[in-house]
Amino acid sequence: MGSAAMDTKKKKEVSSPGGSSGKKNPSLKRRSLRVHIPDLSSFAMPLLDGDVENSEKHSSRKVDSPFSSGSPSRGLFSRGPQPRPSSPVSAPVRPKTSPGSPKTVFPFSYQESPPRSPRRMSFSGIFRSSSKESSPNSNPSTSPGGIRFFSRSRKTSSVSSSPSTPTQVTKQHPFPLESYKQEPERPESRIYASSSPPDTGQRFCLAFQSPARPPLASPTYHAPLRTAVLAAAPGPAEAGMLEKLEFQEEEDSESGVYMRFMRSHKCYDIVPTSSKLVVFDTTLQVKKAFFALVANGVRAAPLWESKKQSFVGMLTITDFINILHRYYKSPMVQIYELEEHKIETWRELYLQETFKPLVNISPDASLFDAVYSLIKNKIHRLPVIDPISGNALYILTHKRILKFLQLFMSDMPKPAFMKQNLDELGIGTYHNIAFIHPDTPIIKALNIFVERRISALPVVDESGKVVDIYSKFDVINLAAEKTYNNLDITVTQALQHRSQYFEGVVKCSKLETLETIVDRIVRAEVHRLVVVNEADSIVGIISLSDILQALILTPAGAKQKETETE
């Protein structure tokens, strides 16, 4: 009896372990809970498994998620009367909890009661780490590509529904969303732009955008927005933009329009896409160097010293004239110094009395600085050297700068002094004019070049009329024809072998306006104009330096500054 009763009890326990009449086995209960734990965790985090239906089913538990949204109505940049910062990633959001709530292992923010209205991320969400970049309303994406996609499509989130008062405000962000209700363009493209494109010459259309981002819809600026953005994040990149903005908005007279134009452009803007640049090593013979200038049709070349691994000077036609002026003795006598000396030897002899370092300029410097350096140092060639690599990029001249300015003159307001004539402005040299006659020997002309430090001599006949002009560039023909051993020939004989680079004699009158003078000297591509009277007699000389001084430096007050410096 006893054994039969015990067998019957065991059978009941095996046949119905979960029944109400039998006792439950504790080991079976624990094993059952272990089996269902993964199901419960997946039910608690439907978004991690990509279950869209579960996400819609639990829409009553939607809260502010630290992940950005791709929806245009619930995007990252939804407008509203007051911004609301996002909650921490790992802290559950509850209606009445402090920001310092304890962390949990669940990345999904849970809210006990449904919110009264949709709640969105504030502007501060874009400054969070990449671990937050996913969307509760779309398929999850944890790759960096998805992060960049949402950060680059912020303009699509311009439409949003009007939100209600947020239940939790922990921090007021320095960028209020009210200033972006009419967002003309992305502010980041102005703040973090690597470089601004060259200006088109129109001083009231200064657009800045980054080449790494798509073109903006509107280049127009709104003053309050620009001021707020630039004031909130100042830095080295903004310094140049702030300077240009000040140039755009400053209230100056029209007389300084060309000065402001030159200050807003860099030397790199004037460098051509393709050009020829000849560089000489200081160990090269002087004679071969001048022959190379003639063969390449250039008037100057930077000098490279291998010992210092840097540029130390310039070799110009003036050096050729100085060598002939110093070492020429008599006709048909070989000039040993010209034949045998190297460039470094000539520099040691010539510069031992007055050593002058190389005057150069950076490609990032303004054209105003280039003009000021040319006129202040009384030079005609200014090499543009990259300070980082040390490479020579280009050689700036008065002619190149004035031509660049003249291209944009029609797009700028015309100052009143452009309608004044040369006599009223007093531009040019009208006293103690140096000139020569057709029968003047070449050696005498070279002496005048050196003593007066001028670049050209008008050739005047017996009646006083200007018949020709002898410039420094014509002297290089002596090297081309190898006739520099006989400098007693006349100027007329030397000019008979003039090369095709002759600029010609371009004349003007003192009664012509400055606008006419600028247009004529640029079109003729010459370095100077000979001012004559009604009888075609020489009255004065107006050079490119005089014109640039009147257009750019005089309105800036640089003339007085130069006098004080000297």
Curated annotation (Swiss-Prot):
Residue ranges, compositional bias (Basic and acidic residues): 54-64, 180-189
Domain of life: Eukaryota
Residues annotated as binding ADP 1: M314, L315, T316, I317, T318, D319, V359, H380, R381
Chain intervals for the UniProt region annotation (Disordered): 1-198
PTM note: Phosphorylated by ULK1; leading to negatively regulate AMPK activity and suggesting the existence of a regulatory feedback loop between ULK1 and AMPK.
GO biological process, one term: regulation of glycolytic process
Chloroplast in keyword set: no
Residues modified to Phosphoserine: S65, S71, S73, S90, S138, S143, S158, S161, S162, S196
Record-annotated membrane-spanning stretches: none
Signal peptide as annotated in the record: none
GO CC terms, sorted: cytosol; nucleoplasm; nucleotide-activated protein kinase complex
Record SMART domains: CBS (SM00116)
Binding site for ATP 1: R299, M314, L315, T316, I317, T318, D319, V359, H380, R381
Domain CBS: 272-332, 354-412, 427-489, 501-559
Residues that hold AMP 1 according to the record: M314, L315, T316, I317, T318, D319, V359, H380, R381
Keywords in alphabetical order: ATP-binding, CBS domain, Fatty acid biosynthesis, Fatty acid metabolism, Glycoprotein, Lipid biosynthesis, Lipid metabolism, Nucleotide-binding, Phosphoprotein, Repeat
Binding site for AMP 3: H380, T429, A434, S455, A456, H527, S543, L544, S545, D546
Residues engaged in binding ADP 2: R299, K399, S471, K472, F473, D474, R498, H527, R528
Sites where the protein binds AMP 2: R299, K399, S471, K472, F473, D474, R498, H527, R528
Quaternary context: AMPK is a heterotrimer of an alpha catalytic subunit (PRKAA1 or PRKAA2), a beta (PRKAB1 or PRKAB2) and a gamma non-catalytic subunits (PRKAG1, PRKAG2 or PRKAG3). Interacts with FNIP1 and FNIP2.
Record comment regarding domains: The AMPK pseudosubstrate motif resembles the sequence around sites phosphorylated on target proteins of AMPK, except the presence of a non-phosphorylatable residue in place of Ser. In the absence of AMP this pseudosubstrate sequence may bind to the active site groove on the alpha subunit (PRKAA1 or PRKAA2), preventing phosphorylation by the upstream activating kinase STK11/LKB1. The 4 CBS domains mediate binding to nucleotides. Of the 4 potential nucleotide-binding sites, 3 are occupied, designated as sites 1, 3, and 4 based on the CBS modules that provide the acidic residue for coordination with the 2'- and 3'-hydroxyl groups of the ribose of AMP. Of these, site 4 appears to be a structural site that retains a tightly held AMP molecule (AMP 3). The 2 remaining sites, 1 and 3, can bind either AMP, ADP or ATP. Site 1 (AMP, ADP or ATP 1) is the high-affinity binding site and likely accommodates AMP or ADP.
Family recorded in the similarity comment: Belongs to the 5'-AMP-activated protein kinase gamma subunit family.
Its job: AMP/ATP-binding subunit of AMP-activated protein kinase (AMPK), an energy sensor protein kinase that plays a key role in regulating cellular energy metabolism. In response to reduction of intracellular ATP levels, AMPK activates energy-producing pathways and inhibits energy-consuming processes: inhibits protein, carbohydrate and lipid biosynthesis, as well as cell growth and proliferation. AMPK acts via direct phosphorylation of metabolic enzymes, and by longer-term effects via phosphorylation of transcription regulators.
Identification of the protein by name: 5'-AMP-activated protein kinase subunit gamma-2
Gene name in the database record: Prkag2
